Amino acid sequence: MDTAETVTSRAVPAPPGGVESATDVLIVGGGLGGVAAALAVCRAGHRAVLTEETDWLGGQLTSQAVPPDEHPWVEQFGVTASYRQLRERIREYYRQWYPLRAEARELPHLNPGAGRVSKLCAEPRVALAVIEATLAPHRAAGRLTVLTEHRPVAAHTEGDEVRAVTLRDLRGGGRHTVTAPYVLDATETGELLELAGVEHVLGAEARAEHDEPHAPEQADPLNQQGITFCLALSHHAGEDHTIDRPADYAFWRDYRPPFWPGPLLGFQAPDPRTLESVPRTFEPNPELDPLDVSADQSADAGDKELWGFRRILARRLHRDGAFDSDITLVNWPLNDYWETPLVGLGEAGERRALHGARQLSLSLLYWLQTEAPRADGGTGFPGLRPRGDVTGTADGLAKAAYVREARRIRAVTTVTEHDVAMDLVGPYGGTRYPDSVGVGAYRIDLHPSTGGDNYVDIASVPFEIPLGALLPRRVTNLLPAGKNLGTTHVTNGCYRLHPVEWNVGEAAGALAAHCLSEGVVPHQVRAEEKQLADFLRRLDREGVQRHWPDVRGY
């Protein structure tokens, strides 16, 4: 890792035995960025290998079970054409297969869950089905090979190039080494940056490095945003679905963070934007017509009413009797885990963090079922049923933890608070890049961190994604394809969201494809006027929006 020191390249000897293969572009990590990168490579006629640690592609949207955090203009502009197609195909899946009410079916902007966090809250399995269908023609044509349940364990470098990556098959322990002229790191934590010795940053930079007002005085690589094991719930009155008491329940029931207004397992929590103590409400299966729900983060964060905040199936959008409960996704302040950093303390540290995060979410569920205060004066909601059938697990938790912050490349261009924070650039300001390869918009949203920081949630402006943020300073053929691009601990807070991750992956895949077709390297594309113009035209043809109209930050 690198905050004060630089990581140097190291060659890793190839392991004996195992499977060996070659492709045009190796994409390690099958989240939204990896999927978008694979589509971009295959659309251009090149071959790709896409790997994924879990057995589900889609990352945030599927295996991590996080409904998309999106900006208020998402239905009009501000995302790539392929991301818009993904959203519309999810809607069409519901229209084709679900017993929607006629008035819901006819909505052009159908929100299947009627959640308040997003204009498109949907079940992880539906998003997975759409992603698999979208990739299917490329797999059938032999352009795309997908290796699920594979994790990178070694990178093989020569000079300033990554020549191959060795992956471990998590099902049987075998090794598979893939050689490729271009390697994309789409992992959730930027794993390849560490394995390949690519110069990178982890955690919080010192304020002096970029003069960011919200950076700490001292750099701290172990100061990272908390992770979350999301879980899916439905509620069935009169039934008892209480789980076994989690092993660490006593600890979490009594846990009081120093910056919290009371116990973490409670309905009183800070407002992320003001840090004032604000009560949350919890009412399973409310009678409010879901057609009356508005999802607009610029007007209302939507997080005060917990059941509807991230609801992914609204029973009242469907014909009477089709579903006896909504399904909601629990990704709340109450189950953010920040006791131990996920990255930077080796495999043992990773295991501790994942175990702690799982125990916290299970403890929250048990508390909800047994001790949570009800509006009628009673305690507990034993009818809460964990929906492992929705998340693809036995316990109802997501397959993987939601990771907000990764290792980040030391990039040719680093996006800092001075490029995006509204109080620094004004409501219509922000840096405009001649090499922009996409756009995004979201508040700078930092969750409580392993360094003891409370929320940092501040206004930002609609921003651009510079090509330079996808280029490592030294390594020539590895590209970031997710939240590991050239941002800071602070600006990661607005560049980590679903549509931005997709855009970064799509741009990285398109860049690798362009370099293969033109016989150039990524840094040449940015440095040479003709190459840059040709590449940007390629993005324009593919429907990648690179600049914003005149819209105000929030």
Where are the language model's segments positioned?
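N-terminal Rossmann-fold NAD(P) dinucleotide-binding loop
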Residues: 34
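Aromatic pocket-lining residues of Rossmann-like dinucleotide-binding sites
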Residues: 41
